[in-house]
């Protein structure tokens, strides 16, 4: 996710 570019683990946003 662009908003979480720092932490490339946006898995928790992929609900």
Swiss-Prot record:
Subcellular location: Secreted
Transcription regulation in keyword set: no
GO terms classed as biological process: neuropeptide signaling pathway
Keyword set includes tRNA-binding: no
GO-annotated cellular components: extracellular region
Keywords tagged on the record: Amidation, Neuropeptide, Secreted
Major localisation: secreted
Residue numbers of Phenylalanine amide PTMs: 15
Biological role: FMRFamides and FMRFamide-like peptides are neuropeptides.
Family: Belongs to the FARP (FMRF amide related peptide) family.
Protein name (record): Extended FMRFamide-12
Originating organism: Pachyphasma brandbergense (Gladiator)
